Swiss-Prot record:
This is UPF0335 protein Meso_3367. Signal peptide: none annotated. Belongs to the UPF0335 family. HAMAP family: UPF0335 (MF_00797).
Length: 87
């Protein structure tokens, strides 16, 4: 009898935890979508003000990397461009 009660309690607790995790994920997904929409709006505003959005996206990607990583990528790119006669 005690084992049945303990098992039921454990299942109830596990179900409650699962529900809480799922609801938390759902809230975060909603926030993520809102943030994504806000970012799209900023890019649209930039485009409307004459900025090249493709270039801005490239700058944002570069700013996420540390300086050493950026320099290494640029060196490799320069090497490949030179090998192909593009510089």
């Amino acid at each position: 009898m005690v084992d049945e009660i303990t098992n039921e309690t454990a299942q109830t607790v596990a179900a409650g935890q699962l529900r809480a995790f799922i609801e938390r994920i759902e809230r975060l997904e909603e926030e993520k979508q809102t943030i994504s929409d806000d970012i799209k709006d900023v890019y649209a505003e930039m485009k409307g003000n004459g900025f090249d959005v493709k270039a801005v996206r490239a700058i944002v990607r570069l700013r996420k990397k540390d300086q050493a990583e950026r320099q290494e990528e640029e060196a490799i790119l320069d090497l490949y461009k030179a090998a192909l006669g593009m510089v």
